[in-house]
């Protein structure tokens, strides 16, 4: 699952960074990109996704910590379903604490966190390493398919899947 952090309007926007990243990574991993047709029903959506019987990537159009009408959250469901999750954060979010709060939220619910990916902006590896969060790297807006950065990120994603003792999607 690929998730973002922040306002619903930014996550649901056509071609949101979360959706673009999920589609690009799905292509690079040779996985289908699956839609979330009803974001207010996480257990049902995860059940449908799991029933496909194959690997997939989906982009969540809500912040995983956002309370749903029944009081649940996607973070809670992702943890209950042991769903490996990748967090996409826009470069403009890096100074806001969104990376740390997203990491803490997902860890609280025991979500298998694959890592964090910066969307756009310039990569400051020293700062990312200093914050101690599980950063995997950066994806550039509009980068060509098969770019070195995407290939490197896919390699790191596969390593994280292995480190978390999860089946690596093929």
Per-region residue spans from a language model:
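Intrinsic-disorder/low-complexity coil detector
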Residues: 31-34, 133, 166-168
């Amino acid at each position: 699952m690929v998730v973002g952090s922040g306002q619903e309007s930014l996550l649901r926007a056509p071609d949101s960074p979360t959706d673009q990243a999920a589609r690009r990574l799905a292509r690079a991993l040779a996985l289908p990109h699956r839609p979330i047709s009803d974001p207010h029903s996480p257990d049902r959506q995860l059940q449908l996704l799991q029933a496909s019987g194959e690997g997939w990537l989906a982009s969540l159009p809500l912040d995983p910590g956002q309370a749903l009408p029944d009081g649940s959250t996607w973070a809670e469901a992702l943890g209950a379903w042991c769903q490996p999750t990748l967090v996409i954060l826009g470069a403009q979010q890096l100074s806001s604490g969104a990376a740390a709060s997203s990491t803490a939220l997902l860890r609280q619910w025991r979500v298998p966190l694959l890592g964090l990916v910066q969307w756009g902006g310039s990569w400051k590896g020293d700062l990312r390493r200093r914050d101690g969060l599980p950063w995997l790297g950066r994806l550039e807006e509009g980068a060509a398919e098969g770019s070195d950065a995407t290939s490197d990120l896919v390699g790191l994603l596969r390593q994280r899947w292995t480190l978390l003792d999860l089946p690596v999607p093929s």
